[in-house]
A protein has these predicted regions:
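Conserved helicase NTPase catalytic core signature
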Residues: 72, 81-83, 87, 174-259
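Pre-ATPase regulatory/linker segments immediately N-terminal to the P-loop/RecA-like helicase/translocase core
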Residues: 1-99, 155, 172-196, 313
Length: 314
């Protein structure tokens, strides 16, 4: 009996395209006479938001506690005091916004109503930040928004590593996803061969010491290669891009960033923002709180304040 969780990419008439958790499942599926699909609601995002809020509430010290107090109390945000930089290709308000980002030690807001060049300003702010930092985290509430800002950064010549389910990423950014770059890495063919050997060895189901020793060696080598490929991809990337909930992806486990940029922050759920903020030393919010608020269908949740964003609070 074969059981695993996958993602439905799309379905039409009698055809369904399913994104598998790893390529090794393809071989397993080919051996099955019949397949069944059981659809269920994915509660992962809600679980991650609850966990993030719990950590924020429980924080007694450290950077997370500092940022929480800045957002929810009258604790002042700190600033650097160096001279303003000039960006002749930007207008005065855009130039001021970029400098506000560079001056911020804790939190900054880039407020950009439609037509004011908010995206241009944000890309410039990220570009200038990368002159001072080796890597930044860029997030947004939706995959569409993440892809949009990521495309602009790629057009600027910045190495972007897109984290997230490839079925939710647009065609232009697909080659920048972690999965595609992982499979394109020079060490991947060797890793694929080892994974294949592990699957074949499992089919033998022997219990001799030599069988276990060989399995252990193969697994150890596979893990070594996986870590080496991951280290290479993250070492080369200047921008790590994901949705807010995607910041909890297993490949980002343990990662910390000096700066987090949240685009379309006025449409981002407050609880989701904290998933990404937990990984950051300072936070830059970009958006327009006068536009549409985040989508919250529950009346009870709206009454409880879920419709209010961090951008409004700050």
């Amino acid at each position: 009996y074969l059981s695993f969780t996958a993602t439905v990419s799309y379905a039409e008439q009698d055809r369904m395209v399913v994104a598998l958790p790893d390529s090794g499942r393809i071989v397993d599926l080919q051996r099955q006479d019949a397949l069944g699909v059981q659809l269920f609601f994915d509660e992962t995002s809600y679980r991650l938001m609850f966990e993030a809020l719990d950590r924020v509430i429980r924080a007694r010290s450290g950077r997370l506690a500092d940022l929480r107090d800045i957002f929810y109390t009258k604790a002042p945000a700190s600033r650097y005091t160096f001279d303003a930089m000039r960006f002749p290709w930007l207008n005065a308000s855009q130039e001021k916004a970029v400098n506000e980002v560079l001056w911020a030690k804790d939190v900054a807001v880039v407020h950009g109503p439609p037509g004011t060049g908010k995206t241009t300003t944000l890309v410039e702010a990220i570009f200038e930040t990368l002159r001072r930092e080796s890597q930044v985290l860029v997030c947004a509430q939706s995959n569409m928004a993440v892809d949009w800002i990521s495309e602009k950064l790629v057009d600027r010549g910045i190495n972007v590593l897109r984290i997230g389910n490839p079925t939710r990423v647009n065609d232009k950014m697909l080659s920048f996803t972690y999965e595609r770059r992982f499979e394109a890495h020079p060490d991947y063919p060797q890793l694929w061969s080892i994974r294949k050997a592990i699957r074949e060895l499992r089919q033998q189901r022997k219990h001799a010491d030599s069988w276990h020793q060989k399995m252990d060696r193969l697994k150890s080598r596979a893990t070594e290669l996986e870590l080496r490929i991951r280290s290479s991809l993250f070492g080369e990337a200047r921008v790590i891009a994901s949705t807010l909930t995607g910041a909890a992806n297993r490949v980002l486990e343990g990662e910390k960033y000096s700066t987090l940029f949240i685009d379309e922050a006025a449409q981002a759920l407050e609880a989701a923002c904290w998933i990404a903020i937990r990984k950051a030393g300072r936070v830059i919010l970009a958006g327009d709180h006068c536009q549409l608020p985040p989508t919250v269908k529950s009346i009870m949740a709206l009454k409880g304040g879920l419709g209010k964003t961090l951008m409004e609070r700050i």
